[in-house]
Amino acid sequence: MVLVVVAKDNDDCVWFFDRVSLLLNIVGSSCKRHGMLRHHQYANVMKALECGILESGSGLNQEMGLPRPGDTRWGSHYKTVVNMIAMYPTIHDVLIALGRDTSQRGEWPKIHTMVGVFESFDFIFSAHLMLDILGHTNELSECLQRKDQDILNAMSLVRLAKSKMQQMRSKGWVSFLQRVTIFCNKYGIQVPRMEHNYVPYGRSARFAQDQTNDDHFRREVYIGVIDKISQELDSRFDEVNMELLTCMAALNPADSFASFDANKVHRLAKFYPNDFSSSDLLRLDLQLETFIDDMRKDEMFKGLNNLVDLSVKLVETKRDKVYH
């Protein structure tokens, strides 16, 4: 899934992921720092439990951690953002401790810079935006990465992702900004007034456009990233491709061809007019009845999981010559 790459086409997202990479290198580069992270996390979870913020239960007391910097799989981006927000006070404490540790003096300039970034509205805003976008497309990305792809469920998840992006764009800004503001207020992070001029954090204002914070954060970043994600989804999964993939799913051999649908297979054939004449399409309807009976009765076709398995088995049994 290339949604992270698409998001990185936005300058603020490039800046954000570069800073995340720096954070992972600082916090996760040594066993000593990992030990510090576990200690601070334990203290904060216990404090939260005593305050009733968290509910104790299955999995909630399991230790969370940040993925290694070299873990570049798509899912690691989402996990990183989730844990970074969930563990924000812990990570902040670790950064402050490292910034005061004389044994880390050589790293102080880098650490002190990261503390400033971590306390900036720009960073928190981008983190929450990535949390929402990666979260709303997480199930789709996981589905598309599985070897035994469920095409019908994948297409349903594509439609849901497209719909969610549209909802975020049309009526999600106010609630999103409120959530970011609440988070910032909780941790003492200054929230800029949206009508004031935008001043980029840690970047030269010389290259910044003359615009308000609202123009930048809402129009350029929030809507800009959502539009890029929506365009990528529309490009990869337009109506024709969606119909084609849905029709292909009708030949999925899983569970004794439970998804078989002769009408969808017929529609699939119509996508290839050079290969199927009108007389071929007429014969196809009758041939499909024979095909599905044959597949369900032959033990050699039991236990197949996907179209690749079916194609291999058809060649092995020379059925590809029968149903040509």
Q: For each predicted feature, which ranges?
A:
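Alpha-helical structural modules in large enzymes and assemblies
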Residues: 1-324
